[in-house]
């Protein structure tokens, strides 16, 4: 893998996916970020096994490839660099990083051990919604999701769609919050699913920086939801 990108774009991308990097884990590779260079873009991915975030930045690729690298060290290093072009060159298990007068070498780990992250390419969106109303919906209910892990189902936000109406609901045993929104999509199938409140909170933190509509996908096994923005 050999490529060139800007420090600004790489720094922003790492900042976005850092929310999904595992802090304490029995699977050490989830403390890494996945780097995958192909088709003129660098994909950066992170997961804590409950939530995953993918993001892409433009770059000039000389050699396609992929690897993983410790997220915290890599993020801090890129943040310390000046606003200039960055060269990334993977040599065996060493990632050689150059930015202006600065050179660094970081040890990598094979991407084969990185947990698979579901893709939306082969899926049709369950529904589409604009960032502003979606943010309002989340913020209107997320505060009353339970914190007590003894009843895991109450620590999530319930999504339900009936007659093209999206309803979000939370409850913690003392409070109940419900809000509904009429979707513009037609013929949306009726569906119910629960998203962990912690994961949905991270989605809401990205929404203010999103201009395009949000596409929500359910995986074929219906046990994972994908927010594409």
Q: Where do the model's predicted regions map?
A:
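Structural preference for solvent-exposed beta-strand-turn elements
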Residues: 1-229
């Amino acid at each position: 893998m050999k490529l060139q990108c800007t420090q600004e774009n790489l720094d922003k991308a790492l900042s976005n996916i850092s929310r999904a990097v595992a802090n304490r884990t029995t699977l050490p590779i989830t403390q890494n970020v996945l780097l995958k260079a192909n088709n003129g873009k660098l994909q950066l991915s992170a997961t804590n096994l409950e939530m995953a975030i993918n993001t892409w930045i433009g770059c000039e690729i000389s050699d396609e490839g992929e690897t993983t690298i410790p997220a915290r060290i890599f993020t801090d290093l890129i943040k310390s660099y000046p606003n200039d072009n960055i060269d990334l060159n993977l040599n065996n298990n060493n990632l050689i990083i150059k930015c202006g007068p600065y050179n660094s070498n970081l040890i990598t780990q094979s991407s084969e051990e990185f947990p698979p992250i579901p893709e939306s390419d082969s899926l049709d969106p369950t529904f589409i919604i604009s960032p502003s109303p979606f943010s309002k919906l989340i913020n209107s209910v997320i505060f009353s999701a339970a914190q007590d892990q003894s009843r895991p189902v109450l620590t999530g936000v319930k999504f339900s769609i009936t007659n093209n109406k999206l309803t979000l609901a939370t409850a913690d045993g003392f409070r109940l919050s419900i809000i509904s929104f009429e979707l513009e999509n037609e013929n949306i199938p009726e569906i119910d699913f629960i998203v962990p409140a912690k994961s949905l909170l991270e989605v809401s933190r990205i929404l203010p920086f999103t201009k395009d509509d949000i596409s929500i996908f359910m995986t074929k096994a219906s046990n994972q939801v994908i927010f594409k923005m």
